[in-house]
Amino acid sequence: MNHKNVLAVDFGASSGRVMLGNFDGNRISIQELHRFPNDPVILNGTMYWDFLRLFFEVKQGLIKAKKYGKIDSIGVDTWGVDFGLIDKEGNLLENPVHYRDARTVGMLEKSFSKMDKDRFYQITGSQFMEINTVFQLMALMEKRPGLLERASRLLMMPDLFNYYLCGAQVSEYSIASTTQMLDARTKMWSKEVLESLGIPERILGSIVPCGTRLGLMKNGICQELGIEPGEVIAVAGHDTQSALAAVPARDKDFIFISCGTWSLFGTELDEPVINGLSKKLNITNEGGCQGKISFLKNIIGLWLIQESRRQWIREGKEYSFGHLEQMAADAKPFKALIDPDAPAFVPAGNIPERIRRCCRESGQRVPGNEAELVRCIDESLAFKYRMTLDEIKMCTGREYPAIHMVGGGTQSRLLCQMTANACHCPVIAGPVEATVLGNAALQLLAAGELRNLDQVRNVVEASAKVSIYEPEDTNQWDQVYGQYKKMFAADGGSYL
């Protein structure tokens, strides 16, 4: 067969890549063509994404792809919840605002004065997080109502890139489900949520499934760059769901961790789980590929180490991630623990000092040097994963033979081993580039080269290496987990 060339554009919260995927009928080989930083810009006190620069970088990737021949298609995935507003002439009204901007502070409670919290969850099945799109829109209506009045269409970040690539103004299902405005059962915008919160339905586009063929790239872009028009595919726009498509799981029941800046921990289901327990535990039902539901929790992940490293660099200490991991591996275990999801750790800044303060206030020994701090973060993440695993088991009534860990976090052998130890479960780590492989494979699925999600995963398994970590020292980890639950689980973990 003829080889297929696809471009996977993958935006993370700190960097972006344009990757070439080549499919020979059995395997996908990937090659990085272009990598670039994705740094927010603070202007007049508001934190923005630099969308124009990011679109420029996509174009650079397209230019670099020319030497590899015709590109059959392109797909874009990004982080969730953020969006751009388009006016009636099709112009971007302003750069998209970053989810870490402070504008949503207090919006969660304000929403409950307009809509019953239980009813809100019953409809959306979504984890309540102040960063969610719905709360960003509430903040916009309160603080800048004129901007929303001028908007003709809201486009989530991957949809925004797709629009400027090919002209389609639609909302892909997986990224739409991060808004907390979607009915989890009907997979459509919830009129009740929108009306209760006063959000205008007119700005929301039609929802299309993952794998929708949106059309050819605009002639103007192709002429500018000197390229042939490739097809734009709406892959799973939320990077988590593109990564999940690439989990090489053979069992129907499996746990996944998409481990990057955020750790998304969950399982794949055919139908949403929405009940009193899932609401109490704040577990979300996110839309996936081919109508699947990802029943998961968003956990602050490697952000804690990334932001700590940035602080140490500001202090003149240039540590690589590998060096930090080795230092942590040599540090004494279980000196102090934190809840990675504590509100104090959400904003950028001096994370090491905030960790010390949390440990001091909770009566624990305070981590001193960098090694102890990184060890504290890794152990705390592993215990948070165990707690979430127990919660998901309670909600689904199922047992899971293994944890599939994908993404950049799999490069930390220490975190993978700690996760296996804490969870009493083998960890199958890899692929590292799950999001890119999933993005590319979903383009092949849309083109008819692959038949279904099972075949997507089989191709990924043939294309990437995995490592297996068996649990060790489980008795010691169990003892400390009991202490962790008492400190950080609701009701002291009595429900677990």
Task: Tell where the protein language model's regions lie, with residue ranges.
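Glycine-rich beta-strand-to-loop/alpha-helix junction loops that act as flexible
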Residues: D77-G80, C210-G211, C259-W262, A402-T410
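Active-site core segments that coordinate phosphate-bearing ligands/cofactors
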Residues: N2, L7-A8, L20, F112-T124, ...
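Carbohydrate-associated surface elements
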Residues: D101
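Short acidic-aromatic active-site loops that bind/stabilize oxyanions
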Residues: M47-F55, S126, E130, I207-G211, ...
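N-terminal glycine/serine-rich phosphate-binding loop of ATP-dependent small-molecule kinases
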Residues: M1-E94, Q122, R150, C222-V232, ...
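Short beta-strand-loop/turn "lid" adjacent to the catalytic site in phosphate-handling enzymes
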Residues: I63-H98, Q127-I131, P158, N162-D183, ...
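Short glycine-rich phosphate-binding loop at a beta-alpha junction
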Residues: K70-T78, R153, S206, R398-G407
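Gly-rich Lys/Arg/Thr-decorated short loops/hinges at beta-loop-alpha junctions or inter-strand turns
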Residues: N38-N44, R119-F120, V170-S177, P200-I203, ...
